[in-house]
Amino acid sequence: MEIYFEHLINATYRAYQDILIKKHGDIYPLRSAIIKFGGFHLSYDWYGRTRLGKEEVGNLIIYTKEIHLNILFAYCLGGLKSDIPNFTELFGFRKLVNTIAHELAHCLMANYKLQFGYKHDKSHGGLTQDIEAFLWTLPEIKELERLQGFQWQELAKNLR
């Protein structure tokens, strides 16, 4: 699944970056070639997080972006049950798509200035909504949504 999420994140990042360039011109000096998917991690205070940074190699500066998602999304995707109240609402598929859009908005805003990538202002909220609407049109999201109906219990019976 990690390859899937890295693919989804980068395909959306590149496509949406192209949309913004057509809209505003190529004014994004801190673009990254890729966004690393840092995996799923347990957290009690975030759905997702974005790490922004830069690496200096001689006179070259490489800007880095990495997205992490809460492990509870993976549990929910896998059909695991939880005693957490409203677990599927809090970590279900719709919230996962919203969280990916939210973190991608941080990455896209950081293309202009790294500090902008940490903001939660009106422009971040609007960009998150736009990216989320875009995500729902992608075949990658439609396929993952289809797989939500997959009978994991049947698969697990055949595992050794």
Regions found by a protein language model. Give the residues of each.
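A short, surface-exposed helix-loop junction/capping segment
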Residues: 1-3, 103, 109, 149-155
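A metal-dependent hydrolase signature that marks the N-terminal structural subdomain at the beginning
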Residues: 1-62, 89
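Active-site scaffold of zinc-dependent metalloenzymes
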Residues: 41-94, 107-111, 123-129
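Conserved aromatic-histidine-acidic binding/catalytic patches
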Residues: 4, 88, 92, 96, ...
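Post-HExxH zinc-binding segment in Zn-dependent metallohydrolases
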Residues: 114-159
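N-terminal low-structure segments adjacent to metalloprotease catalytic domains
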Residues: 1-7, 76, 95, 160
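Short alpha-helical catalytic segment bearing the HExxH-like zincin motif
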Residues: 95-103
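Charge-rich, solvent-exposed alpha-helical interaction surfaces
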Residues: 7-11, 15, 19, 103, ...
